């Protein structure tokens, strides 16, 4: 039977094959006519790439069917250059951890009563456990930015 192979240039070549011929045999016949090595050939029929070990009848290729020939591309994408930074990276801030830091906020009297040294923020958005920073002339909440300023008595 006769089949057609459309090449990359748009030229159509005719091949005399049998339905029991393998795709390898067809590629060999294309090499004899066009000089393209079989390892670079990719044959496509009905949107599917034809595998080498299969026969023409496996893909239901009948007389006067047209196969499309495309070249196989090897390799992947272009290698990218690694970015070189001119300035060194900024060192991330490490928080200092102090053991038993809560002891700074409370004082125990001689009779066993606990006295709070720092004021807790009264704002509802902060919640319990948020203390205000004690400055010389003010108290400041770092979370909600509530500030109490003390007036100096003269």
Curated annotation (Swiss-Prot):
It holds the Pfam family Ribosomal_S27. Residues 1-76 form the Ubiquitin-like domain. It comes from the Eukaryota. Gene3D superfamilies: 6.20.50.150, Phosphatidylinositol 3-kinase Catalytic Subunit, Chain A, domain 1. Coiled coil: none annotated. One of its GO terms (biological process) is translation. There is a cross-link at residue 76 (Glycyl lysine isopeptide (Gly-Lys) (interchain with K-? in acceptor proteins)). The keyword Ribonucleoprotein applies. A zinc finger (C4-type) spans 121-144. The keyword Ribosomal protein applies. GO terms for molecular function: protein tag activity; structural constituent of ribosome; ubiquitin protein ligase binding; zinc ion binding. InterPro entries: Ribosomal_eS31, Ribosomal_eS31_euk-type_sf, Ribosomal_zn-bd, Ubiquitin-like_dom, Ubiquitin-like_domsf, Ubiquitin_CS, Ubiquitin_dom, Ubiquitin_ubiquitin-like. Keywords: Cytoplasm, Isopeptide bond, Metal-binding, Nucleus, Ribonucleoprotein, Ribosomal protein, Ubl conjugation, Zinc, Zinc-finger. Disulfide bonds: none annotated. One of its GO terms (cellular component) is ribosome. There is a cross-link at residues 6, 11, 27, 29, 33, 48, 63 (Glycyl lysine isopeptide (Lys-Gly) (interchain with G-Cter in ubiquitin)). In the N-terminal section; belongs to the ubiquitin family. Ubiquitin is encoded by 3 different genes. Crp-79 is synthesized as a polyprotein with one copy of ubiquitin fused to ribosomal protein eL40. Crp-6/ubi-3 is a polyprotein with one copy of ubiquitin fused to ribosomal protein eS31. Ubi is a polyprotein containing 4 exact head to tail repeats of ubiquitin. This is Ubiquitin-ribosomal protein eS31 fusion protein. It comes from Neurospora crassa (strain ATCC 24698 / 74-OR23-1A / CBS 708.71 / DSM 1257 / FGSC 987). The gene is ubi::crp-6.
